[in-house]
Amino acid sequence: MSNDMTGPGTGRGVLSSLGDRMMGRASGSYAKVSKKSGPLDGLFLSQLIPALLLVLAGTITIWTASLTIADANFPRHLVGVALGLVVAMLVWRYDYRNLAGMTTVLFVLTCFLMVMPKIPGLGVSSHGMTGWVRLPLVPVRFQPVELGKVAAIFLMASASAQYNGKIERFSDYCRLCGTLLVPLALIVITDLGSGLVVLFLGATIIICSGAPRNWVLATIALIVGVSALVVITSMTDGLPHVLKDYQLKRLLVFADPSIDPSGDGYNLQQAKIAIGSGGFFGKGLGNATQAGNGFLPEAHTDFVFALYAEQFGFVGCVVLLGLFAWMIFATILLAMRIDAPFGKLVLVGCAALWTFQVLENVGMCIGIMPITGIPLPFISFGSSSMLTQLICVGIVQSVWRHRQKAA
């Protein structure tokens, strides 16, 4: 029997305790889920509705981008959305608990997806990065790292669920950190931005598994120290340069955009201009002059938030970010209602994935986060990203759908 089949009262880590205080676990309307409640109950819809509205917002934004940007292939975007919705439905029907306890299999799968672009004959370069894969006899390419994020969620949830919400031994904590470290090291080779996503979601799952605060704080201090050392050595002649030149440049541009006025600094400046020119209500659908006139690079991918903001203005941005907040908060509420450790932590991982990607993408467009190329969930152009986000929606619904079934 998997750890996810555990009854009420187990797996009560940080998230459960917070849920008890916020929601009143013993007596609130959400405290006892009726066995007669169907898949279309309030909590189900509270997470699904904003997700579908975000897909619609992304589709409209990419359609406007396709009017002036050749790479923004709108039919291909629609194919990605359709495929994602179909896969999400299949995931929703699948009992996610079949993956509980399969830590070794999930570990191997996650690592394989991370290194897949580096396999000779499979990896495809784009914009100087080898993060895509083109399978033999298949005329499409995809980013396995995006699917690797989903695998990492299940990996860390499976590895952490066995402790039932309380990690007591330091050796167990180190084992969890090591489980995260290996695929993280592999993904950083291909995509530093995605590596940060995996680090955030993995760390969030470990924290919500009941890791002692002192251990977590010490780990954070270690990560900060190592990161600072990596940056310093990469900037110093005669020392090993761990960061690639473009990665170091992006960090320096974050500190001072004038360092690279024709490269990343230019991209950031144009993104700010696009956002600011949108004003309060925006220029209107299809009237994004910064992107339309070619001033805003990667307007349909990395800087899609700037493209959206120019057309829909401050009000539109508030609505968009409100939808993200609604979806993420609803996912957290669902996690609070789940007693099974594995299901709870899977939902935590999905919420962490969306949270970090939204904060990083929006933050880099307005200059408060370094430029990393992390896509904005449901909005940025890219079938691999859209498929991953919709799979996560399906996972959330699967966890909620199968919450009542006995082992």
Language-model-detected regions and their locations in the chain:
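Membrane-helix boundary/helix-loop-helix interface segments in multi-pass membrane proteins
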Residues: 2-54, 59-190, 196, 362-377, ...
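Alpha-helical transmembrane segments of multi-pass membrane proteins, especially transporters
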Residues: 76-77, 171-176, 219, 345-353
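Hydrophobic alpha-helical transmembrane segments
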Residues: 79-87, 149, 311-329
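Hydrophobic, glycine- and aromatic-enriched re-entrant/interface helices and adjoining loop segments
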Residues: 126-132, 218-318, 341-342
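Helix-loop-helix junctions and helix-breaking kinks within/between transmembrane helices
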Residues: 177-206, 233-237, 312-316
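Hydrophobic transmembrane alpha-helices of multi-pass, membrane-embedded glycosylation machinery
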Residues: 199-207, 221-224, 393-394
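Transmembrane helix-bundle signature of multi-pass membrane transporters/permeases
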Residues: 295, 307-310, 350-354, 382-385
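Loop-to-helix entry and N-terminal half of a specific, functionally important transmembrane alpha helix
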Residues: 332-372
